[in-house]
From Swiss-Prot:
GO molecular function: arginine-tRNA ligase activity; ATP binding
Keyword Aminoacyl-tRNA synthetase recorded: yes
Cellular location(s): Cytoplasm
Family: Belongs to the class-I aminoacyl-tRNA synthetase family.
Pfam family of the protein (one): DALR_1
A single GO BP: arginyl-tRNA aminoacylation
Name of the molecule in the record: Arginine--tRNA ligase
GO CC, any one term: cytoplasm
Biased composition (Low complexity): 298-309
Amino acid sequence: MVKDRVIELFRQALAKGAAEGRWPALEASFSVEAPRDPKHGDFAVNAAMVLAKAAGKPPRDLAQAIAAEVRAVDAQHEIAGLEVAGPGFINVRLAPDVWLRALGRVVAEGTAYGRTEVGRGKKVIVEYVSANPTGPMHVGHGRNAVVGDGVQSLLRWAGFEVTREYYVNDYGAQVQTLARSVHLRYQELFGRQVTMPPKSYPGEYVKDVAAALKAEHGDRWLDAPEAEWLALFRDRAVEHVLGLIREDLRAVNIEFDRWYSEKALYESGTVDRFLRFLAEKDLVYVGKLPPPKSKKGQPAPAQAASNSAHDLGEEGIAASDDLTLFRSSQYGDEVDRPVKKADGTTTYFCADIAYHWDKRQRADALVDVLGADHGGYVPRLEAALEALGASRKDLHVVLIQMVNLTRGGEAVKMSKRAGTVVSLREVVDEVGRDATRFIFLTRRSDAQLDFDIELAKRQTLDNPVFYVQYGHARLAQIFAKAREAGAPVPEFDLEAARTLTSAEEQDLIRRIVAFPDMLAAAALAYEPHRVAFYLQETIAAFHSYYTQGKRTGERVISADARKTAGRLFLCRALKQVLANGLGLLGVAAPERMESPETRDLADDV
């Protein structure tokens, strides 16, 4: 990467100056970033500002000295200019050939271009989706799935060893409610009149499970006590729903390396071992809510106690119960959290931190992709990890805001098929996998997303995924035209590349070469939307360049063989970056596209 080369030159210069006693060794890291205004150069370096205090020198004076040392170590003359600016930044302008050789590496590396080793040697578990196995996936789950898959893909491209994990909530009240819903439908199949309770599951899939159980067991469970049929009906229902969820995920091309069962967490003894571990570390005690005084000796905030009691109410716990409480307030949480109820059963939080305890033993870092409504849950998990001897920084939570589904600007709230919330499958069936995946990434995950079904179906340039894919197809057709004109797609030629001198061509070169840095930064920030933004902005720059060339006569293919070779190579590098970026996001990069709006795909190239 070009940026890495700038960093290396500055490190050499700083080390040489320190060895000669002109300034102390730089212990902290310094930044190398592209300035917002290209007039200020290719990169701005803050090394002098970081080192100034230790060196006992004004940052600008130190910057001048460092710049001189960088010039001295730049034996290959890769830097065309260094200028001290502002409070002590060093603005760097690279020699043109540095950018052109970097462009050559795009094609040389091909499908691997953009991969880095930022995370080499580090194991990460990315847990995403983890929708309760009580029904098919809705569009909110779909956004979680696509964002989570984008995060894991970015981390793989950055060199991390990634495990994709789905936590199956197949233990507890919700799956028991599902089992009872199936049993009611099972009774219906024998002609009985039943009333579905308000919290039951009404979907057609419940009837399917009931029908399968009837076919296999007849009326065996019709009048049997609940204790005899509950586990069977629960397991069959969960198995069936997980099958539906897997199909939904395959529809958007998402697979997991591991499906981690909450039930297995209990059956394997992991939860019991975890509780013993907490007791041995004196991290739990028996008490009541509101919790005892916090670490600073002050009563816990009334609101925090109230919130805790409210949360517990959902698990059937009263504030007056004797509970086994985890000392989470000692680690930054608002209140101590219960891990065991008065009746001896464990809480959801207990299983969740036991699961994170298990994950942390298998990986160096954890990424949880959660709905935005879980934001208040995050401090509890962080406190738990810290109490268990890990670092809060070992856990990163990506929050997913809701999706507002619209059709031509009108809200779509109900499914035509099920009479409930719209399922992910319905959206994918109507607009396609590529549009679904890409549009879910057209906004930050922590911002609400408006998903217009009609826009997603359009084969027009106002559809963001069509716009990017059309750019890739346009490039493919340019090469087809070039072959017809007897101008084969060239290998890298520095002399031909030196003809790429226009401002638009230079801008495209810098955008293309920035691809690996962008991916690495997006991976470390867990933000796959950056890739979608980059693709849209980069192809917009190309469409503008292409259109202007047709208008001015500076077409890609011209009578000037050297210019043609240079421009075709630029197009080849851009096509590779688009394909890699789309592939990383799980979106196809078509070679040909046609719609009434794009029939002149490669005319007058």
